[in-house]
Amino acid sequence: MRKGHVLLGLAVLTTAVRGAAAQTPQLPLNTLNEVSAALRACWVPPPLDQSRAGMQITVQMSFRRNGELFGHPRITFESAGASDDERLAYRVAVAKMIKRCAPLPFSNALGNALAGRPFTIRLIDHRKLREAGNVP
């Protein structure tokens, strides 16, 4: 396995989701932008005491035509300088995001176009930066 690429284990993906403030998409998704927006709506960053200001994490995954996850998601980037505990907290948050959202409600056209192809999304935790007034 190459440096910077971490496979999310099945144990992390089956982590229980409790009290999620995120929304699961309801309407059929027709575009890649809608897929990104749906995944971001399902993402809940780690608690502030486990987070890092400006933390970025990128995950690559593939879907089946019906919106189910195909294979295992892979972390392809994490902010430099994050501690192992911070990285783990964000990996768990990504796994919970996927668990909340999957399967995604793809339209037939989007499902046919996206099936089996890599889909990458970057998530950025701006919460502490917003509090400091550094992000709009």
Where are these regions (language model features)?
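N-terminal signal peptide c-region/cleavage motif recognized by signal peptidases
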Residues: 16-19
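A short, highly charged nucleic-acid-interacting micro-segment common to nuclease
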Residues: 22-28
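Short loop/turn motifs at secondary-structure junctions and domain boundaries
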Residues: 49-54
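A short, polar/charged loop-to-alpha-helix boundary motif
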Residues: 79-91
